Amino acid sequence: MSEMTPREIVSELDQHIIGQADAKRAVAIALRNRWRRMQLQEPLRHEVTPKNILMIGPTGVGKTEIARRLAKLANAPFIKVEATKFTEVGYVGKEVDSIIRDLTDSAMKLVRQTEIEKNRFRAEEMAEERVLDTLLPPAKDQWGQIEERDTNTNTRQIFRKKLREGQLDDREIEIDIAAPNIGVEIMAPPGMEEMTNQLQSMFQNLSSGQTKKRKMKIKDALKALIDDEAAKLINPEELKQKAIDAVEQNGIVFIDEIDKICKKGEYSGADVSREGVQRDLLPLVEGSTVNTKHGMVKTDHILFIASGAFQVARPSDLIPELQGRLPIRVELSALTAKDFERILTEPNASLTEQYQALMATEGVDIEFTESAVKKIAEAAFRVNEKTENIGARRLHTVMERLMDKISFDASEMSGQNVIINGDYVTGALGDVVENEDLSHFIL
């Protein structure tokens, strides 16, 4: 789990997301509170529950981007889901319980990777010995039995040196590695998930312990053997328990598009993917126990962050019980032309930086002047005002139009230096800057 302070988390988010200080502060405090809670002693630790967050704001202002960046910072089990993908229990479609199952699978991968890294040094040594055994098969005695290998022979040490220096990387060898598990996906009828999990485990156990001969280059064989040896050093039952603990204590669920499951108007028919889904979400958010193939998972201390544009519906259209379980509300503001200017230049891997790097692969040096950045931002802002406001995503459309000619001709422009200034932008985006013909920029 991340031990970053709220100020450090906000600073990290600032490198990728412009503005939205309130939203950044809210998620930073929530993430830090996860760490604070773990410093408490029982039984007080059990009593401290997470304060779930509802982020409200128009499309394209950074709600989903905050979730993406948070996933990298959290160093904890994290899953982002779309609320519209789920249906009420009893109908065809995904049930909300699958969120926790997917989160547990994510935790298994995270914990497994951590354990592999812990054992990597030992696994590398064992993999190296296996490669050397293949290159220098141990001798057999007069009865055909393999003699105990001597790891310190001169020949073996010479080969070990060559192996570590990469001199043998392109040589092909045949090795025995564990056969991959049979991946079987079974769609379970409602209420029969436990049987499905047992069937999946049965199919996976069919291939466990089996090995497969594969021919590959030594550099690829080493990677495969390191993973193979590291997997042998991991206790599967201990891994499951660590993953379940990680989900229960540090898990974070980000539910996007929650406004799309709000009930609109007085509609009395079956509400399979709206109010029914909200009611199914209630026990998860409040705290319940979900059966997964790795074991039972309690959701009492999982942090839920929901977000939605709420352009048609309002937060008050959510059922009251769910509103009460999302106590922290953060409003994200619409982006201005000044924000667009900052988005084009300030974040790590900004749009202008991306296009410069792409054109550099063709030997073309691109330079954006301040006036060009200002004109691009104004053009994107104007299109958003006159048509559908899709926030920062509009910049992608405008930039593609601006760079269209250069991108097409770049392969014949090697060695050239192109300066994109205000006049160039006006010429390329003239139909939006002067004539306000916006049809080219509507997605």
Curated annotation (Swiss-Prot):
Pfam families: AAA, AAA_2, ClpB_D2-small. SUPFAM superfamilies: P-loop containing nucleoside triphosphate hydrolases. Keywords: ATP-binding, Chaperone, Cytoplasm, Nucleotide-binding. GO terms for molecular function: ATP binding; ATP hydrolysis activity; peptidase activity; proteasome-activating activity. Its main location: cytoplasm. Transmembrane segments: none annotated. It is found in: Cytoplasm. This is ATP-dependent protease ATPase subunit HslU. The gene is hslU.
